[in-house]
Amino acid sequence: MNEQELRANNQLSDWCVHNLNTKPQLPYPADTFDYVLCAVSIQYLTAPIEVLKSALGVLRKRGRIVIAMSHRLFPTKAVSIFQHIAPEDRIKLVSSYLEIAGFDEVTALDRSPTNADPLWIVTGLKVS
C-alpha cells in the first residue's frame, strides 16, 4: 500500500512505508512482534532471504511468519525465478527461503477457495 492509502485508513494505530528492495531490514527493534505477515508480495523481493532474516529478528520467541501467495504476479515487477517456475515450485522455493533464513517448522498449506484464485500459505516458526 502507498502512503496515501495508509494515511486514509483510520483503523491503523501505526504504519510505515519502507522499500525492502533498497533496504531489506525491517525498521523495527528485535523481538517486537508475535507474527509477521507477507501478503502476496514475496515474488517482488530482490533479497528475500535477507528480508526473511530481518523478519526472524523482529519476531519474539515462538513467533511465526505467514506468507500468503497466489499464482498471479506483475511480470514487470516480479523477480525472474518466479516467472520461470511452476506454482508448486514457488511454494517449495519460498519454503526453502524460510529454512535458509533460520525458521523452523516450515509448513505449506493450500487454502484455495473453490472457483477462485489459489491461495497458498507458507509459515515458519522462530524457536528461540
Report the location of each language-model feature.
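A short acidic, Gly/Pro-enriched loop at the edge of an enzyme's catalytic core
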Residues: 23-36
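Core SAM-dependent methyltransferase catalytic element
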Residues: 101-104, 111-128
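A short glycine-rich, Lys/Arg-flanked "PGG" loop and its adjoining helix->strand segment in the class I
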Residues: 49-64
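Class I SAM-dependent methyltransferase SAM/SAH-binding core
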Residues: 1-26
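General small-molecule cofactor/ligand-binding pocket signal
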Residues: 16, 107-109
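Conserved class I S-adenosyl-L-methionine
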Residues: 64-95
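A short SAM/SAH-binding and catalytic strip from SAM-dependent methyltransferases
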Residues: 34-49
